[in-house]
Amino acid sequence: MKHKILLVEDDKDIQEIIEYNFSKEGYEVTKCSDGESAIDLVRHETPDLVILDWMLPNLSGSEILRQIRSSKKLKKIPVIMLTARTEESDKLRAFDTGADDYITKPFSNSELIARTKALLRRVSEDSFTDTLNFHDIELNRDNKRV
């Protein structure tokens, strides 16, 4: 299954580079370049992961992140901030708002892909449950009890 990545980046050159590299790795990439489009896409397409620039037209990346984290449906989507903001205070603010990772520009495509794979792997592992339920029967896989 292809993972769906939402790339929110207003620099078209960076968009193209990321889309090219992620497509080569088997990801499906949807791109947008402003905050309002990002909110619309994340709500209607529910990506597996969001790569989010901070400084965007219409709505900042931190505000988009805040809206994602405040939505019951969307709050578990992993978000990687990809931004030119390099100050420690910016990084801390992003993590406090709910970013899962933070990468500063200029960046390595290989590192961005590796961090994406790691986040998606962790999210996939967390989605498995220790119990299986069927009608009134519950099987606990950890302690092997019914």
PLM features: what roles do these ranges have?
Residues 15, 57, 75, 87, ...:
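The feature encodes the CheY-like receiver
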Residues 9:
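Conserved acidic carboxylate
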Residues 26-34, 41:
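Short hydrophobic/Thr-rich beta-strand motif most characteristic of the beta2 strand and flanking loop
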Residues 53, 83:
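Active-site residues of response regulator receiver
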Residues 16-24:
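Charged docking surfaces used in two-component/phosphorelay signaling
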Residues 3-4, 118-146:
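Short, Lys/Arg-enriched segments at the junction into DNA-binding effector domains
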